[in-house]
């Protein structure tokens, strides 16, 4: 995995060197062709290379004559054929070099894109919950997709054209001086003018692309929120307001995009105008020879104009190619910075290296936590408890009491603001993070199933799990009964989000998946809320028989946590009651009221 986008560039230095080099050789052949054309014309007029005044053209004419006479009866035709063959050979060589360079560019761009995308994905899935919230889902999605694509395009155009286009422009300028210093001077005037236009446009465009990518983040965030919350939106009949809100965001993106394209669209018309003026200037400079010169002089000046027009065309096409190339490279630069910001981000949750086998599995010591690092607004305040190996901890409380926050701290999705958490006697911050996550299995209330099959969802948690192990986990989670009814059993298809299962079925599958890794600690975060009390009871009875596994059960139902060895009642982030079920009924009025109210409801 790479640490920066530039690391991927370094992995492909040969391609970044060889690709442009091949394009430069191909471009050099292209630059020679107009001079060969002029050499053939001048040789036909003077019959002997020695009579040609232009030294460079004379040398090319002499080179043509080295191949002898192919048509003895017609030297002019022979020279023309030889010149045509030479030009054809250069064209074929240039074509072959271009194809090789194009392949190198495409292959390298895909490789860089793959390396960046894989490294970025790996970084994102290893970010803590706090880190992901800081970046925002929209930003992460846009960076993974759009920004990676922009970097890929930047690599493609860099290898293909970033060296060739300037080389052709400068080369055509040099060869125009070889043709005629006045023509070269005219060309020299237009290149700085064009570059001034480029500089102004590209400077403004670069700033606008940063804003455009930010708007893409907003679109991604909004669309993700609305798609995930579509049922809620429909339930409140709020479709129209959401449509208006989304329309506002997309129109902002559209306005920014249109503005930058308007700016970029100025380049070609300006280049066309400058080129047209130079064409007129060339004809004007050669007017005296064309009108009053001898026949030989007229032919020579005509060949010069033909070659000059060819070089002007090369300058023009080189200039036309540069804006999209440079714009893509600028966009790639913006995207590279956004990607590097994530790849180089120092996570607030750093892994430790220590391990232990202490009998006390989890211990909270004066733990306080605030989502905004604000001591005046703690989500948890002075939490103290310990749970031994094989015991069951029950956590109960109303909405917003801090139940999920406490679980997030155990999983180390966040770090404590004050106090410390010990895992197997070691400060959880010093414990190896990957080992911690492999030993603790969390099953959330929101059952997350992934598109694929039932088996593939289990293999995601434990890649070496056998069918027998999966079946055993399904039985423990009371999911075997309905899964076994499918003809394809474990190969039964799972739609996106598990939409082809009921809420209770999804929860049982997720509990089974949590068991497949044989965790040392199993956390059920209100993950039986969609189950009936009988099924809930069966699962808890099965789990209680696993003596070497510590269980943490979060629920709003007293019946679900009544058999726990230790129950913590949370209210507004504080532990207002702690003990077993009987102790809390005797000592905690709030717990007793919750229990009695639920008993009355049946």
PLM region descriptions:
Residues 11, 15-28, 157-211, 283-295, ...:
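Transmembrane helices of ABC transporter permease
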Residues 358-602:
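ABC-type nucleotide-binding domain
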